[in-house]
């Protein structure tokens, strides 16, 4: 059987010992002097304090104040245990304040320290404390240093109750070494025996794994937390002085896109004089790039000459400045020598006794006047010297500005050269692709022609060839129209001449165009045959009674409707006038239809032979763009007005592309258009000849009456003239605005400002229209 007692067992009553320790701690707390320092007391060395680990590491367990609050609740002072009553020697001057504090706070240990993680509460905890708490902290100020064992050297009993060690009982002598600083220290663990339970507490205090013992005072614990680095203080970050990084401008694009009228925030700058609005030509073709390059080279040479002239002027001014400085130094030396000589003469003459006073005075006056004259001459030389220096500085500044401008022009020239090189490469690749596509199409057509044809296909091929022969006959007029364009093509840059296709390439293109037209005619004939097989439509909408077909012409009831509109188009295509304005704003959807090139001119006989009319497009005036062009035996259009000699005509391929853009950008299809569908049915059934009393025939103006390039030129010239007029008016208003004094005429300045803003808006709209027309003219090359 194991022994009932072990070595660590203490043969005392646990409950009695615990209550004794609690009573002594309560005595010191109620006296109020428990935190005074006793300098006479010296702890004994070599002996461990009996109750040293008392109140140790109990932040998560029940404190003594909780225990005392529990068993003293709902009890009067007379019914309290004797341990808690102040009796005997405890009746002193601190009794009243101690019990008043007990009654107010409801706890024996009201001293609570703020959390260490909040450093802002430390000065408040130290400054706003009562007298007993100041005494409590004063002990740590005097003797708050950790010793070798990590304990605080504190005295727990008042000084006036101290007795010599030999007269003090053993129990009191042992209790003098206790340091009951705060109720947060833990009780010692109780021995666990099988026949008795733990006294006073149901649970043992958990032992925290800490390197040092937790000190009882707030100040010492805060210092310990700072030493251990557990104060949770975040590093201070200066958000006001953050380092900003700005990337360098490596592309130099900002100098090309920069607008001087707008600041960094996107607001318009306010100056005394509003900026001038000059249009910048956009170099979008090789010819324009070549011209821009030549202009830049000329400007570069002009700037070089100006720089050389400035250098020569600077050298001349430097030589002149050196001469003036030499003259100034000579005059200065001469004036000094004259002053010295005059002073010597005056001294010698005044020393002589036989000197005539009148002659000396007159000579003195002459010398004084000479001195004043020389001083004035010296001042004039100084002013001249300063003027020459200012001129020299201005010349140096001009030279620096010329150098900067020259550098900017050189950089722009290099960028244009690079852009020109890239465009050349793109053009070469485009031509190679075009040649490959043409050869592939020619091969495919040759293969198709080598195959045997059926009877229907042979008939269709014959009809297509007949139509093609008629178109070749009617195409003689188009050659006259393209004379001016061929002359303009010969005047192009040598770069374009070097990239022009050969004669064999042109023949291949012509053959391909013929093959496409033939296929188009075959497709139309096939559609016609299918519609004949299907038979007439039963439920067809009746056409308006006001329009009747009279041998291919339309009769209108009112004379206001008479215009250049054909009867085949009807009122459905007149509604397309609103779509004509979209041609200038949109770049054109060039892939709405798969057929890129359509036959542009068909005679009346070919239309009757095919019994199907092509779809056309009406412009703003209601005229058809797809009708043939007839020049009446002249080399100009129907207007009869020759081209201006100063303006350059667009080449032939440009005109074709413009016409293609105009035809393709119209949202119109033969299968979807009601008017064209009705026209096809009428052609199938046959024309109805109806007479009408008020017979007004429409003027059959053939379209295009002039080349599209000429029309574009006239519109652009009109818009540029309007823009120039607006600019002149803007300059007049700006001069008037600048003539007004800022001290007066506020209302006038406001009125002129509003007019200037409206003029700027008008000029912007005109410039946008010109820009869109240039897009129409240039965008056809990429279709």
UniProtKB/Swiss-Prot annotation:
| Primary location class | cytoplasm
One GO cellular component term, please give it: cytoplasm
Composition bias (Basic residues) maps to 536-551
Q: Does the keyword Amino-acid biosynthesis apply?
A: no
Its domain of life? Eukaryota
**Could you list the residue ranges that cross the membrane?**
none
The UniProt entry's GO biological process terms, in alphabetical order, are:
meiotic cell cycle; mitotic spindle organization; mitotic spindle pole body organization; negative regulation of cytokinesis, actomyosin contractile ring assembly
According to the UniProt entry, which residue ranges have a biased composition of type Polar residues? 201-216, 437-453, 474-504
Q: Is Phosphoprotein among this UniProt entry's keywords?
A: yes
Q: Which residues form a coiled coil?
A: none
Q: Where is the composition biased (Acidic residues)?
A: 566-590
Q: What does this protein do?
A: Has a role in meiosis.
Indicate what this protein is called per its UniProt record.
Answer: Spindle pole body protein ppc89
Which organism is this entry from?
A: Schizosaccharomyces pombe (strain 972 / ATCC 24843) (Fission yeast)
The organism's taxonomy opens as: Eukaryota, Fungi, Dikarya, Ascomycota, Taphrinomycotina
**Protein's gene:** ppc89
């Amino acid at each position: 059987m194991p022994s009932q007692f072990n070595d660590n067992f203490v043969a005392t009553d646990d409950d009695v010992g615990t209550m004794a320790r609690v009573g002594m701690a309560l005595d010191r707390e109620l006296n109020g002097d428990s935190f005074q320092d006793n300098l006479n007391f010296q702890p004994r060395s070599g002996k461990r304090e009996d109750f040293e680990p008392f109140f140790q590491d109990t932040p998560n367990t029940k404190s003594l104040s909780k225990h005392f609050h529990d068993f003293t609740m709902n009890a009067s002072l007379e019914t309290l245990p004797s341990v808690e009553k102040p009796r005997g020697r405890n009746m002193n001057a601190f009794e009243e304040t101690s019990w008043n504090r007990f009654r107010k706070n409801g706890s024996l240990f009201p001293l609570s320290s703020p959390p260490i993680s909040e450093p802002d509460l430390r000065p408040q905890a130290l400054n706003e404390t009562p007298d007993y708490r100041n005494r409590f902290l004063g002990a740590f100020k005097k003797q708050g240093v950790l010793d070798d064992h990590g304990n605080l050297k504190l005295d727990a009993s008042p000084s006036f109750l101290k007795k010599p060690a030999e007269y003090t009982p053993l129990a009191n002598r042992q209790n003098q070494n206790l340091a009951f600083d705060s109720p947060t220290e833990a009780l010692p663990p109780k021995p666990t025996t099988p026949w008795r339970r733990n006294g006073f507490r149901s649970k043992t205090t958990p032992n925290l794994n800490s390197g040092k013992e937790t000190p009882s005072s707030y100040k010492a614990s805060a210092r310990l937390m700072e030493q251990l680095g557990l104060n949770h203080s975040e590093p201070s970050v200066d958000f006001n002085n953050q380092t900003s990084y700005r990337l360098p401008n490596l592309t130099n694009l900002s100098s090309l896109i920069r607008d001087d009228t707008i600041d960094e925030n996107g607001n318009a700058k306010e100056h005394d004089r509003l900026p001038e609005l000059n249009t910048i030509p956009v170099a979008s073709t090789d010819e324009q790039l070549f011209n821009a390059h030549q202009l830049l080279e000329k400007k570069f040479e002009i700037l070089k000459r100006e720089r050389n002239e400035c250098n020569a002027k600077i050298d001349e001014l430097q030589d002149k400045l050196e001469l003036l400085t030499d003259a100034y130094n000579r005059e200065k030396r001469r004036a000094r020598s004259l002053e010295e000589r005059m002073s010597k003469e005056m001294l010698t003459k005044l020393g002589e006794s036989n000197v005539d006073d009148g002659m000396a005075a007159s000579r003195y006056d002459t010398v004084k006047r000479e001195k004043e004259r020389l001083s004035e001459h010296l001042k004039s030389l100084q002013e001249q010297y300063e003027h020459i220096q200012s001129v020299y500085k201005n010349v140096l500044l001009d030279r620096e500005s010329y150098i900067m401008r020259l550098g900017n022009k050189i950089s722009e020239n290099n960028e244009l050269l690079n852009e020109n090189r890239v465009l050349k490469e793109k053009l070469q690749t485009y031509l190679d692709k075009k040649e490959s596509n043409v050869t592939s199409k020619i091969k495919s057509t040759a293969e198709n022609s080598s195959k045997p044809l059926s009877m229907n296909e042979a008939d269709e091929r014959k009809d297509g060839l007949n139509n093609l022969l008629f178109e070749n006959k009617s195409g003689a007029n188009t050659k006259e129209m393209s004379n001016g364009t061929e002359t303009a093509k010969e005047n192009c840059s040598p770069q374009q001449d070097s990239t022009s296709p050969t004669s064999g390439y042109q023949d291949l293109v012509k053959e391909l165009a013929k093959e496409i037209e033939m296929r188009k005619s075959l497709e139309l004939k096939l559609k016609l045959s299918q519609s004949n097989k299907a038979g007439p439509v039963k439920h067809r909408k009746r056409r308006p009674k006001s329009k009747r077909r009279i041998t291919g012409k339309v009769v209108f009831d009112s004379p206001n409707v008479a215009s250049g509109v054909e009867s085949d188009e009807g009122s459905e295509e007149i509604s397309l006038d609103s779509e004509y304005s979209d041609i200038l704003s949109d770049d054109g959807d060039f892939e709405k239809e798969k057929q890129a090139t359509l036959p542009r001119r068909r005679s009346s006989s070919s239309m009757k032979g095919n019994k199907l009319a092509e779809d056309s497009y009406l412009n703003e005036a209601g005229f058809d763009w797809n009708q043939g062009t007839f020049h009446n035996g002249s080399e100009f259009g129907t207007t009869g007005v020759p081209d201006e000699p100063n303006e350059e005509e667009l080449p032939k391929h440009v005109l074709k592309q413009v016409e293609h853009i105009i035809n393709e950008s119209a949202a119109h299809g033969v299968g979807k258009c009601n008017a064209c569908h009705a026209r096809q049915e009428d052609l199938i059934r046959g024309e109805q000849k109806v007479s009408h009393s008020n017979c007004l025939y429409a003027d059959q103006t053939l379209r295009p009456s002039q080349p599209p390039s000429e029309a574009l030129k006239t519109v652009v010239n009109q818009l540029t003239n309007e823009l120039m007029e607006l600019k002149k008016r803007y300059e007049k208003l700006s001069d008037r605005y600048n003539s007004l004094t800022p001290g007066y005429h506020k209302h006038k300045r406001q009125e002129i400002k509003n007019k200037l803003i409206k003029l700027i808006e008008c000029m912007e709209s005109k410039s946008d229209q010109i820009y869109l027309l240039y897009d129409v003219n240039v965008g056809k090359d990429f279709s």
